[in-house]
Amino acid sequence: PTRRSSDLRVYTGVVLNTEPSAHVADEKVEQTEENMEILLDENVENKEDIDALGIQVGDIIAMDPRTVITESGYIKSRFLDDKLSAAILLGLAKAVKDEGITLHRKVSLLFTVYEEVGHGGSYVPADTAEMISVDMGCVGADLGCTERMVSICAKDSGGPYNYNLITALVNTAKAHGLDFAIDVYPHYGSDVEATLRAGYDIRHGLIGPGVYASHNYERSHMDGVKNTYELVKAYVTE
């Protein structure tokens, strides 16, 4: 991982358990919070050495994403949830500008880094009527989505999404011949649910490219990205 200190210095290191060497340790050590550590790529022996580097409580540790895009179109990386959809929305903004696309409604693009802690969508412009969370689509057992599709979520752990909005997204996907799946996510929450909890009276929806092995070393596909991009673009321009 990379560690960024409070004075913006950057250090590298590795995440290991306390007995990582199979040829040395007597028993296998499970990866739990109690026995995992950050091994800095610095010559340090004690707390004073660490302090001298400017490293302190509250500093950020960022894992190497290890991003790979294969010739067959697969995208492998950490943090595809939700870097992929951020790229999709930035691509949409660029297309609107470069191609002179006319939008027939007001469209706001909101980026948040707080979805995982529950309050990412707690603010939206006051005149918002619909809110679509462009997040990741789930891929796994009992789900129809693959990495090459755009997933349209009908319901997650927070309950069902707005039926009329989901129906409109499905009809748009069908009209444009997009490869999509409608799924229910059993262990999932999105920014737009925070919007509802904040008291906004809106229609809410959730879509995203299929991502396998979420919150892990994740995998998606360029086709899933393209299908999601085309769905968002078609929906906001028609």
Model regions and ranges:
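N-terminal hydrophobic/helix-forming segments and targeting peptides
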Residues: 3-238
